Amino acid sequence: SVSRGLGDVYKRQILMEQPDISTPKGRRDLAMILLLYDSAARVQELCDLRICDIRIDSLPVVHLLGKGRKSRDVPLTKPCAQVLRQYICENHLDIPERRNDQLFTNPQGKKLTRSGVSYVLAKYIHKANTAVDSFFPQITPHCLRHSKAMHLVEAGKNLIYIRDFLGHESIETTQVYAKANPEARRKALETMDTRMNTPAMPDWNDDPDLKAFLKTL
């Protein structure tokens, strides 16, 4: 079902609260999971990201290389961009010599694999289920992509925009999400708005808890 996964804001909040952001690894994991959802990236696209693929300025975007080696630029929300900015600065990834390095690596400094990303997500799903008593079903990285697609449809984004956002070859593939919600489909067909209003992200050094902020995601 295309509606599986993080079906509401509360679930997303619970998941994003699980990484321990008092540790570098927890901050990396939050950045990774938040980017995976925010960009609706395929898991391999996330693994392939290099530092130069992230542009963090007044209009933050991530450059994704998808199926058939077709690339697309996906806009990022301000909260996601701020988390990424802090992750990049903290790890000194913002120097010219490192621009072609992998954005996310495993503990050995090697490129992340799809199974590695799945392992990280599964760990936090398990942690969330322990905290909230089996609150989540089995969620894979691809479920985050499904969830983002559904949320774009429900927000009334037009289908051409969603197709390009997801990197679909055909609008018919994108319509699968819209058909799951007829009213959302009508709105998606009518609207041409392509931007989302998002809150500003506090510095995690100034606000190590972040829970109040995460409620706004």
What are these regions (language model features)?
Residues S1-R4, D8-L217:
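Conserved catalytic core of the tyrosine transesterase superfamily
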